[in-house]
Amino acid sequence: MEDFVRQCFNPMIVELAEKAMKEYGEDLKIETNKFAAICTHLEVCFMYSDFHFINEQGESIIVELDDPNALLKHRFEIIEGRDRTMAWTVVNSICNTTGAEKPKFLPDLYDYKENRFIEIGVTRREVHIYYLEKANKIKSEKTHIHIFSFTGEEMATKADYTLDEESRARIKTRLFTIRQEMASRGLWDSFISPKEAKKQLKKDLKSQGQCAGSPTKVSRRTSPALRILEPMWMDSNRTATLRASFLKCPKK
C-alpha cells in the first residue's frame, strides 16, 4: 500500500501526510491504510477548490486558464492541511471578517460565495452512515457537510452540493480510479476491511523480511485532519500548481 500511495499521489501531498502521521505518533509503515486515506482526503479538498474563483461582481466562476489580468479571488479557503495554530488563525480571521459563527472543530474549507465552512468526507462505507457520524460530531447547522464515496455516491447538507456537476464528477472519477487501481493490485479489500488489513500487513512485513512476531495491531484511533500546509499553498499560483499535481496512477 505504501508503494501504491507514493506512485499515485503527488509528492507534496504525500509529504504532508507523512508529517501529519509523524506528528501524531503514527507509523506509516504500519498504518498504511490511514496513510492512503489521509492522502485521498487531502487531494479531494484541493480538487474541491481547484478552478473556482469569485470575480469583481461577486459571482462564482470557473477558470481553467490563468489570466494574470483578471481580478479574481479564490472562492474556497483551504484550511485542511495547515498546522493547528495557523488553521485556527485563519478560521478566526474569516469569522471576524465575514461574521460567520466560529466552528467547534476545524473544518476543511471556507466558501466565500455561500459564506459557510465546509467539512469534506471521503468514505469507504455507506455515505449516509458517514454523513450522520459527521453531523453528530460537528453538531452545527452552520458547517456544511459534503461526503464522497469511492463508488460515486455523495451526500450533502440539504442536498446542496455546492459545486457544479462537472467539478463533482472530476472528484468522483479520481476516487473511482483510486479504487480500481487498488483493486488491480489486490489492495482494495484490505483498505475497506480491518481484518483484511491485518492480513495484508503481515504479508507485507514478511515480504520485507521483518520478524514474524512484529507488532501488527492497527490503531482504531482516527487521525486528526492534516494541519501542515506548505507556504506554496498560500501562493496565488496554487491552482495551477495543484492542477499539474494530480497524477494518474501508473500501471504496474
UniProtKB/Swiss-Prot annotation:
One GO biological-process annotation of the entry reads: viral RNA genome replication
Entry keyword Mitochondrion: no
GO molecular function term, any single one: RNA binding
Predominant localisation class: host cell
| Superkingdom | Viruses
Which InterPro entries does the record associate with it?
PA/PA-X, PA/PA-X_sf
The similarity comment for this entry is:
Belongs to the influenza viruses PA-X family.
Function in brief: Plays a major role in the shutoff of the host protein expression by cleaving mRNAs probably via an endonuclease activity. This host shutoff allows the virus to escape from the host antiviral response. Hijacks host RNA splicing machinery to selectively target host RNAs containing introns for destruction. This may explain the preferential degradation of RNAs that have undergone co- or post-transcriptional processing.
Name of the protein in its database record: Protein PA-X
**The encoding gene:** PA
